[in-house]
Regions:
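HKD-type phospholipase D/PLD-like phosphodiesterase module
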Residues: 2-12, 34, 52-134
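Primarily the HKD phosphodiesterase
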Residues: 17-77, 178-186
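Signature of lipid phosphatidyltransferase scaffolds
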Residues: 102-186
Length: 186
């Protein structure tokens, strides 16, 4: 089910999406400057190797730091399981966690949240029987958006990747987190 939101309700939905991300968070925005509320919501996930953060930013080919500032980039680099991508043609804005997605006009930029007229469409990420029901009645906005933005991620340039490393235990039936290793840092 899709829901139209604007103003402070949009800010609340984005903050809620960050807070309630259990296993995965996708941030797609040309310009990113996190509000302190969003950083606070993510801090307890920094050292969780099961939590995957995927970030795509864009624009400003001559100086990428104008699209993603150094402070925010350093904040994201702390995550145990994170991939940061750059797409110079990016204009779309999409935020998603395990349960919901938000298609929005708003950059993830503190100024935009406080000063601009912005809107968003909040959708639920369907699974199981709900997904089957949506296929039957033809409502697939959330899944279409999820798939589209995953294809955008795949086509973007990977500029940073921190990957969790595990040790197999009990004949490979379980695994124990050891550390994270930076695979890409451009």
């Amino acid at each position: 089910m899709a829901k139209f939101v604007k103003g402070s309700e949009l800010n609340h939905e984005i903050d809620s999406l960050f807070e309630n991300a259990l296993n995965e968070l996708i941030i797609v925005s040309p310009f990113i400057k996190l509000h302190n509320r969003q950083k606070d919501a993510l801090r307890d996930k920094i050292k969780d190797p099961k939590f995957k953060l995927t970030l795509v930013f864009g624009k400003n080919e001559s100086d990428k730091r104008r699209s993603l500032g150094q402070d925010d980039f350093e904040f994201f680099k702390q995550f145990t399981n994170v991939q940061v991508y750059y797409e110079p043609r990016l204009h779309a804005k999409y935020y998603a966690n395990d349960d919901k997605g938000i298609l929005s006009s708003m950059n993830l930029y503190e100024y935009s949240q406080n000063n601009n007229i912005e809107f968003g469409i909040v959708t639920s990420i369907a699974s199981g029987l709900d997904r089957l029901k949506e296929k039957v009645i033809g409502i697939e906005l959330d899944n279409d958006a999820w798939q589209y933005f995953n294809s955008v991620i795949e086509r973007s340039e990977l500029v940073f990747h921190n990957e969790p490393l595990y040790e197999s235990n009990m004949l490979g039936l379980s695994k124990k987190y050891i550390r994270s290793e930076v695979r890409v840092d451009l």
